[in-house]
Amino acid sequence: LTKPQLNILPAEDPVEYELEGVGQVQIKDDIGLSFAAALRSFLRQDPEIILVGEMRDKETVDIGLKAALTGHLVFSTLHTNDAPSTITRLQNMGTPDYLISAACQLVVAQRLARRNCKDCKVPDDDVNPKVLQDLGFTAEVASRVKAIKGKGCPKCKDTGYKGRQGIYCLLYTSDAADE
């Protein structure tokens, strides 16, 4: 996304990583530079891509979704428990359904799960195939699942875990969802 010909405008609180070739804006509510104020300013600068650190209030949501409707690619974050809850959260903030369905193309929810320690992982034979079937796996696939667990070692401080792994849920919108 970082091509010189693209006008990318991010509003962040705080700016966590410096992006080469991108003019980042640090939100400062104490001087009136809110996410909503930054978005209003961005729309006068002919951006191709707008990054909004967080949709915290109705005004920011409305401006962000309207920017998406006028041809801008808008990325943002919103605190919810899962991807489908994003729609409910936007509705609870007072956003009309037509605006949500017209402007939202993709919702990504992220969870960070603990990763088994590579240095002490061992097979876990305690996985019940019935539990896997209840989760939607076919009996054939469930019987072939090989699970692992960390037994604990000095490298993971005897926890069996070291690091985190992203798990993502994607919610695509469609014409059927619009109806």
Per-range role (PLM):
Residues D175-E179:
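A short, hydrophobic C-terminal helix/tail in secreted or cell-surface proteins
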